[in-house]
């Protein structure tokens, strides 16, 4: 995607492999900064502190992080240690584990002195696959938007959190259909949930849509149900950090409430995700997906730009009050209209996914 007319990806290696560059998403939307990662530890910290975030992107970042670490210690013990360190950064998104397992499986049989360059090459392939998958998700999802637009009016899409190009290498998942539809001339407007506590919708999704010229409106998290009751939303499209083999969707906290409101009001509710987000080993998302509990300070404090152009962090919660901060929730498959994948739109059922991924039937 483009920033001020210049194409960017969220992550890209420096020539020669001395560093991997990422967009520092903690600085958006008020500052656009590139950060260099030179070690596995720096990659892990970037994932942990959400300099990079979004399930597909943290998977790619972990892959490059493993490659960076193997430059210093390519031994068997080093491979296992670095992979374990990166895997522990964020427990919910399955793409992280998927990318590390893919690399580790390729690298273990190799002589140690060949592992680092092979890891960089494979991380690059994962990144390119992500771009292709997200573009395909965009094409499939755009057809859903176009079908709604055929009724003769603007299509209003509600999205939650940020599942755009900032959450992937490029294009995004939930926002990819919107970009493809918009670029094709389909009249589309997006309601952007602010997405507390980190305000990733207001800060990141709005930033993306504004840069791309997509009409949008930022709304408070609690406004979605009201909008649906009054016919203001035609469909919901969200991303996913982990989707079970039976179609349960784990996504940013608050997604479940939007799905309930959509179900009650007859609004189609879709999740957009690449195959790397599907956890084929799980059938019950509520019982089986570990939910990351983040620092309560994300709830009690807000950081933003002041009127004089500076930045400040303020406390917004009564001092001394206990805080809970689960980062994700699980939307049961029964509330999900469909799963938009790189191979097409699947029913949110085990059979629906297996029809798109028949090669998983033997493994399922």
Curated annotation (Swiss-Prot):
Pathway: Amino-acid biosynthesis; L-methionine biosynthesis via salvage pathway; L-methionine from S-methyl-5-thio-alpha-D-ribose 1-phosphate: step 1/6. GO terms for molecular function: S-methyl-5-thioribose-1-phosphate isomerase activity. It is an enzyme of class 5 (isomerase). The active site is at 241 (proton donor). Substrate binds at residues 53-55, 90, 200, 251-252. Pfam families: IF-2B. GO terms for biological process: L-methionine salvage from methylthioadenosine. Keywords: Amino-acid biosynthesis, Isomerase, Methionine biosynthesis. Its EC number is 5.3.1.23. The record marks 161 as: Transition state stabilizer. The keyword Amino-acid biosynthesis applies. It comes from the Bacteria. InterPro entries: IF-2B-related (IPR000649), IF-M1Pi (IPR005251), IF_2B-like_C (IPR042529), Initiation_fac_2B_a/b/d (IPR011559), M1Pi_N (IPR027363), NagB/RpiA_transferase-like (IPR037171). It catalyses: 5-(methylsulfanyl)-alpha-D-ribose 1-phosphate = 5-(methylsulfanyl)-D-ribulose 1-phosphate. Belongs to the eIF-2B alpha/beta/delta subunits family. MtnA subfamily. Catalyzes the interconversion of methylthioribose-1-phosphate (MTR-1-P) into methylthioribulose-1-phosphate (MTRu-1-P). HAMAP family: Salvage_MtnA (MF_01678). This is Methylthioribose-1-phosphate isomerase. It comes from Methylobacterium nodulans (strain LMG 21967 / CNCM I-2342 / ORS 2060).
């Amino acid at each position: 995607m483009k920033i001020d007319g210049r194409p960017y990806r969220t992550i890209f290696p420096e020539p020669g492999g001395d560093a991997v560059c990422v967009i520092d998403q903690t600085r958006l939307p008020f500052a656009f900064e590139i950060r260099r990662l030179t070690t596995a530890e720096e990659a892990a910290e970037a994932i942990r502190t959400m300099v990079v975030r979004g399930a597909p992107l943290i998977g790619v970042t972990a892959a490059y992080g493993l490659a960076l670490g193997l430059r210093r210690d390519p031994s068997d013990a080093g491979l296992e240690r670095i992979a374990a360190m990166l895997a522990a950064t964020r427990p919910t998104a399955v793409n992280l584990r998927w990318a590390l397992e893919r690399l580790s499986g390729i690298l273990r049989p190799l002589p140690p002195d060949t592992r680092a360059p092979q890891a960089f090459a494979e991380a690059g392939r994962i990144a390119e696959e992500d771009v292709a998958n997200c573009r395909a998700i965009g094409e499939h999802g755009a057809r859903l938007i176009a079908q709604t637009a055929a009724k003769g009016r603007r299509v209003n899409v509600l999205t939650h959190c940020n599942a755009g190009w900032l959450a992937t290498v490029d294009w995004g998942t939930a926002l990819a259909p919107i970009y493809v539809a918009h670029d094709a001339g389909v009249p589309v407007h997006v309601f952007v949930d602010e997405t507390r506590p980190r305000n990733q919708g207001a800060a990141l999704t709005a930033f993306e849509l504004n840069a791309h010229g997509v009409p949008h409106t930022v709304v408070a998290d609690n406004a979605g149900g009201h909008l649906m009751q009054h016919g203001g939303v035609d469909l919901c499209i969200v991303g996913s950090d982990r989707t079970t083999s039976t179609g349960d969707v784990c996504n940013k906290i608050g997604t479940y409430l939007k799905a309930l409101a959509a179900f009650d009001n007859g609004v189609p509710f879709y999740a957009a995700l690449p195959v790397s987000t599907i956890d084929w080993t799980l059938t019950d998302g509520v019982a089986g997906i570990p939910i990351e509990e983040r620092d309560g300070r994300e709830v009690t404090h807000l950081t933003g730009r002041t009127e004089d152009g500076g930045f400040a962090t303020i406390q917004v919660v009564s001092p001394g009050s206990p805080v809970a901060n689960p980062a994700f929730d699980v939307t049961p498959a029964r509330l999900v209209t469909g799963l938009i994948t790189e191979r097409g739109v699947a029913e949110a059922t085990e059979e629906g996914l297996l029809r798109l991924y028949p090669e998983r039937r033997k493994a399922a």
